[in-house]
Design a protein with these regions (language model features):
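Function-dense linear segments that define catalytic or interfacial modules
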Residues: 1-54, 74, 123-126
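Glycine- and aromatic-rich loop/turn segments at beta-sheet edges
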Residues: 34-50, 90-101, 145-161, 205-225, ...
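Aromatic-rich carbohydrate-recognition surfaces in CAZymes
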Residues: 55-181, 194, 237-252
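Extended, well-ordered alpha-helical scaffold segments
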Residues: 76-86, 127-142, 186-201, 256-271, ...
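Catalytic cores of carbohydrate-active enzymes
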Residues: 96, 178, 184-292
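Carbohydrate-binding/catalytic loop surfaces
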Residues: 102-117, 153-164, 211-234, 278-295, ...
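Catalytic cores of secreted or luminal carbohydrate-active enzymes
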Residues: 303-318, 334-365
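Conserved small/polar residues in nucleotide/adenosyl-binding loops
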Residues: 369-370
Length: 370
């Protein structure tokens, strides 16, 4: 839990001023030619600060840890962070993936702030920014030129060429935005972004029963489900289950819930001897990095919650059960508390495979680990 809170830092001073470094030119993952500005925090009619401004590591795939855990333990934080992220966009046009020194880093991919902001609103926690303004800001960032990083090809074909990982992320983010549109009564926007969230289906490969990357001509990039090419720090075995918004559809494509769970169970059996800890893009299941952090909970969506219970226990004991860096967090990508957040959720027996981003958020209940 200490790591879960350590990853965010206030950047505003006691007088309410904060640095704005959003005005500059993108150079790869960073920004150059920055024009530094000093801005002032918003205040209410009584002169009280409405919200603070924050730095953080990227919110990449935090729908499976921080978005859920913050709402349970520190419900003010999703509200604070959402308002801060929207303020960044007000200043510089883009919603940060991970705000750094008052500006952008472009580290990781997509618009990972969307599930965080949507979950804050759909759980009734958004108080410090206007929901409609937040929605319009995210909508702008889900179009070409926005932080989601999509182009016209994605809008036309539904998938990111040569990258199944980015497709899975973008589709989930589009689904999350559609869920907020439902709550706001924006039926046309809900339908539009909902339709965009189905593109991953074009990457389903029947002969492998997994999602694989395709190029612009619709050709598969490779045949190896354990190869990381076309994924982001993952592979087909790890990333396929990340279509959290449409797991029943994935099960149907695989031939039904029994085959769906049988395939996932095989992956866990293969990963268990290595304690579910692998390097980027390696192994069948990895709890050393973000892309697989929901996988053990997926069995519940396949009608076999006892397998979720079994593998959650195994993962929590083997991957997160130690007290040293190489045993407690898989010796890998803890980032801003994400692996610690997954372990905490496993221990308290609560999770949300959809990151509490649904129009009616749902928690999955497991047994408490004493």
């Amino acid at each position: 839990l200490w790591h879960v809170l350590l990853g965010r830092h206030k950047i505003d001073d006691v007088n309410g001023e904060y640095p704005d470094l959003t005005d500059g030119q993108r150079a790869g993952s960073f920004t150059r030619d920055i024009r530094v500005k000093t801005r002032t925090l918003p205040r209410d009619a009584a002169g009280r600060v409405v919200h603070h401004m924050y730095n953080s590591d990227a919110f990449w795939l935090t729908q499976w840890n921080l978005n859920v855990l913050w709402g349970l333990g520190w419900p003010e934080m999703p509200d604070e962070m959402s308002a801060s992220l929207i303020r960044y966009a007000d200043n510089g046009g883009l919603i940060p993936r991970g705000p750094c020194a008052g500006g952008y880093t472009y580290i990781m991919s997509g618009c990972p702030a969307t599930p965080l902001i949507v979950s804050a609103y759909n759980k009734g926690l958004m108080r410090k920014c206007d929901p409609m303004h937040a929605f319009r800001t995210m909508q702008r960032n889900h179009m070409p030129g926005g932080m989601q990083g999509i182009g016209e090809f994605y809008l036309e074909h539904g998938y990111q060429p040569k990258n199944a990982g980015m497709t899975i992320e973008s589709n989930f983010q589009d689904w999350a935005l559609a869920q907020m549109a439902v709550r706001l009564g924006l039926e046309d926007k809900a339908a539009y972004f909902g339709n965009r969230s189905h593109g991953w289906r074009k990457l389903y490969r029947p002969d492998q029963q997994l999602l694989f990357p395709k190029d612009e001509q619709g050709q598969w990039l490779h045949d190896d489900p354990l190869r990381g090419t076309g994924s982001i720090e993952a592979n087909a075995w790890q990333a396929t289950w990340g279509v959290s918004h449409e797991l029943p559809t994935l099960a149907t494509l695989m031939g039904g819930y029994d085959k769906f769970c049988e395939k996932l169970n095989y992956a866990f059996e293969q990963a268990a001897p290595q304690d579910f800890v692998f390097g980027y893009g390696q192994g069948y299941v990895s709890y050393a990095n973000q892309p697989g952090c929901s996988n053990a909970h997926v069995f519940s969506w396949g009608g076999k919650p006892w397998l979720t219970q079994y593998w959650v226990r195994r993962v929590n004991e083997q991957a997160y059960g130690g007290t040293t860096p190489d045993r407690g967090y898989g010796g890998h990508d803890e980032d801003q508390g994400q692996m610690g957040g997954v372990s905490a959720l496993m221990s308290i027996g609560l999770f949300s495979t959809r990151g509490t981003a649904a129009a009616r958020p749902v928690y999955e209940i497991l047994s408490l680990i004493h």
